[in-house]
Amino acid sequence: MKKLSILAGFVLLIFACKTDPGEKRITDPKDYDLHLSTTNRPTYEEAISSKEFWSKRLRPDSSGVGELGPLAGVYDLLFQTTGNPNFLRNAEKLYKKGMQISANDKDAFARGLAHNYISQHRFKEAYVLLQVTLEGPSNKHQTQLMLFDAAMEVGDYEKAYGYLGKIKNLKDYHYLIRLAKWSDHRGDLENAIHYLEEAKTIAESRDSKALKIWTYSNLGDYYGHAGRIKDSYELYLNTLALQPDNAYVMKSIAWIIYSEENNVQEAHRIMDSVMINHKLPDYHLFKAELYEFEGKVDFAKSSQIDFVNAVKDGKYGEMYNTFLIEIYSEAEPVKALKLAEREVQNRATPESYHLLALAQLKNGMTKEALRTIELYVEGKTCEPMALFHTTLVFKANELTDKVASVKKRLRDASFELGPLLTKKIETL
């Protein structure tokens, strides 16, 4: 998901700061227009068909073990294709039922449930479940793969590295994509890209559609982080060729059009199409940023409110805490602080702690915010929003030299941050 900034009340005419739309043109509507069709939904239609098939085979008392797993997987896929969290909860119930009644595949259902928990941002529950599963009869390799994922999510990096060592195999696709994630975590983007490119070669040699879709879209993200925007765009198009209704990739293309080309109207057009069938709340935040870029403050505020309401009405649980903390920090700082403290308990990572520091700062806790940054964020992540909030804390504490140092790093992340936040950084 792209990192979106919500800069309340910050309205600047910045069109002169970058080249005019067209001068840096990378994208072409002819490349993706076909995929904006709201009726071309092959992934969703296939998922619905599979749901009907497995539902009919499932016994009324849900006691058919062979049907529970596939049906739960279909519900997970339906969440991915619609953004409706009810599908995640449906899948959760089925995985739990499978663990309860299965004689031989409890660990497979446990891994499915753990993956479901991670999607719901219930990271600690996933981590504990996988640790228990590893101790019992299980496919150790598959469980250790997921334990790495869960350990990274909760910030247990020492254990994550240990799990990575246990599954080491440079010819294994699933090891390589995790090694890429570990490299990215350590700030080694060059090797992160290298390992994902190796994984891409394996996915293509197997001609696995699912693996190619995942690899192309994620490698496209890494290329974007590295400033290889054209390469990123090409991989997103490759993804759409395999999965025309991939909403994440369409949003990523819209981000290129906005952040790199300054073509706000085209970005709006893409997102308006995506949002018809795919209902993730954070799309409203992207729209808010586009409106703010145009100077349409009222529309931006309205879209931000739409986001908050969508999270509440959709019962998304903990899934959007990070975005809510940023929003609440401006208008309801006490609420932001409480939510940030809860998020740190759920996910003790630098990406959570920098939001805690932001909330502390907005509550006038300047020294506490600095302590949080120095203990849990500084030198522990290269994530642009973490660096931005670090800069705010350094400035509030009058650490001028540190502000200048971090600003240099942020300039290299202008594509990820977007033009609004990039301009804000220059004023610090």
Question: Where are the regions a protein language model picked out?
Answer:
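Alpha-helical adaptor scaffolds
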Residues: 212-213, 308-364, 368-378
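Generic helix N-cap/helix-start motif at coil->alpha-helix transitions
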Residues: 30-31, 65, 102-110, 136-144, ...
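N-terminal leader/linker segments that initiate helical-solenoid repeat arrays
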Residues: 17-108, 128, 161, 404-428
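Residue-level recognition of tetratricopeptide repeat
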Residues: 73, 80, 115, 149, ...
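Solenoid-like repeat scaffolds
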Residues: 59-62, 96-103, 131-138, 165-172, ...
